[in-house]
A protein has these predicted regions:
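A short, Lys/Arg-enriched amphipathic alpha-helix followed by its capping loop at the start of a domain
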Residues: 15, 19-26, 44
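Short, conserved SAM-binding/catalytic segment
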Residues: 39-49
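Short SAM/SAH-binding signature in class I
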Residues: 65-71
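Extreme N-terminal starter segment of soluble prokaryotic enzymes
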Residues: 2-6
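Class I SAM-dependent methyltransferase "Motif I" SAM/SAH-binding loop
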Residues: 8-14
Length: 242
């Protein structure tokens, strides 16, 4: 067991809590508004508290956790949608995730916690690759995502856009050594993690107390990906023999 705790926003049927318990992390609470997914997660994670609508939550009053995860609604970012971007009613809920993280950290600091002890220390965000190109002007939404996450611990942070004509890369990182802050993102395809279809998603990890985010997202996940590919080969071989 790692002793780590996590909260899941936009929880759905509990993808983040499932990953958490498989790695010794305790899912403490989840925010979801749809009845069926809540029933599913209550069955699989009976000890996880359901806290309700994200827009009605106060991060300072939630049980503090070391990790806050969330895949904010993707409909306004997806290339298959109308592409209202972060200004859209659904995908704009990303800002609620930022608000809750800020409120929880402020409450912890008011209790006297500092440095790596301030919760949450980590934030994970997941979304569709369309987030790289959505916005007005084009590519603006992901710039805002990066900037707002930096502002959790660097209030006056400014994030420039990508190089003209290039767009955002599929993987990248930000290191702010003077603030002990790091952020990394990469686009992963679920076909390499045991799913029988192509399903690309952006995964972004922020570390508000050190420069470890790239190490966790790149090095640690590469080891897991290699393990997943080996397991997938074994499964394929078994299916072929049967």
């Amino acid at each position: 067991m790692t002793g780590l705790t996590m909260g899941s926003l936009f929880d759905g049927i509990g993808g983040f809590p499932l990953a958490a318990i498989r790695h010794g992390i305790t899912p403490v609470w989840a925010s979801e508004i749809e009845a069926f997914p809540i029933d599913v997660t209550k069955h699989h994670f009976p000890g996880m508290v359901h806290v309700g609508d994200i827009t009605k939550l106060n991060g300072a009053k939630l049980p503090p956790v070391q990790i806050v995860c969330g895949g904010s609604p993707c409909q306004d970012l997806s290339v298959a949608g109308a592409r209202a971007g972060l200004s859209g009613e659904r995908s704009g809920l990303f800002m609620e995730q930022i608000r809750i993280v800020k409120e929880m950290r402020a409450a912890d600091m008011a209790r006297g916690r500092t440095g790596i002890d301030v919760r949450p220390r980590w934030m994970c965000w997941e979304n569709v690759p369309g987030a790289f190109s959505s916005g007005n002007p084009k590519y603006e939404d992901f710039r805002i995502v990066l900037e707002e996450i930096m502002r959790v611990c660097i209030p006056d942070a400014r994030m420039p856009g990508p190089n003209p004509g290039e767009g955002w890369p599929d993987a990248g990182m930000l290191l702010k050594e003077e603030y002990a802050f790091s952020l990394a993102w990469r686009c992963l395809d679920a076909q390499f993690w045991g799913l029988a279809q192509r399903r690309k998603r952006i995964f972004l990890l922020a570390d508000f107390a050190s420069l470890y985010a790239p190490l966790l997202l790149f090095d640690a996940l590469d080891e897991l990906e290699d393990k997943g590919e080996e397991e997938q080969k074994c499964t394929s071989a078994t299916n072929t023999d049967s």
